[in-house]
Amino acid sequence: MYPEFECWIYLHEPSVPKETVHALQQYTNVKIILKTGDLITEKPMMWRFEAIDDPTVDVMMSRDLDSRFWRREQYAVSEWLKSDKVFHIMRDHPWHSSKIQGGMFGVKKTHISWKSLMDQVFQDKQTRVYDQTFLANVIYPLYRDSLMIHASFHKYEGTECIDFPFAHAEDDYRFVGEYVYADETRNRVNRDELIRGYI
């Protein structure tokens, strides 16, 4: 789907079986970054944001490991990459209510150091959405003047939001950020909620 990109996977070494790590390392376009430490204090959902500070990285796209790629995402990303906009946001389901979904955005390299910002910001140990809180409160204002936003719902920015290249109905109501479930019934529940969003 993204042949010019390398997939960086951040793993908590004590929690992931060595066999899994070894299997992932067999892919030539995959880089494994092993992390350690307490999962509460280390804030693992933020690890993936560190990539944009790497000197070899010009463009970073943050995705959840348990979500699928669909062509509607690919088309939207292509539109952004061809533009002069620095930051890309996607919201494609009624449940995508955050300004920036942690696994549905992209950013081009600028002078901004994300790691420095993350080190400065205190995150509540109890919240499960600390990554999206950081993105909304710290990152969003910094890139506010250079956004491309593909949004099917929650168009907070009004006319600045643009539609995805084609309708959900053309893809059986699949959506960007859709999770991978072994039980297709759960997938159907999510798509039914998407359909209700149009009613």
Positions of PLM-derived features:
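Conserved donor-nucleotide/metal-binding helix-loop-beta segment in metal-dependent transferases, i.e.
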Residues: F69-I100
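Preference for well-ordered, secondary-structure-rich cores of eukaryotic proteins
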Residues: W8, H12-P14, P55-D58, Q74-K85
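Short aromatic/hydrophobic "clamp" motif used to bind/position activated sugar donors
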Residues: M60-S62
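Short conserved active-site loop signatures built around small residues
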Residues: D66
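N-terminal anchoring/stem segment of glycosyltransferases
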Residues: M1-D38
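Catalytic core and acceptor-binding pocket of nucleotide-sugar-dependent glycosyltransferases
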Residues: P94-S97, M104-I199
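A short acidic, amphipathic alpha-helical/loop segment
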Residues: E19-A23, A51, E73-V77
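A short, glycine-/small-residue-rich helix N-cap motif at loop->alpha-helix starts
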Residues: L39-W47
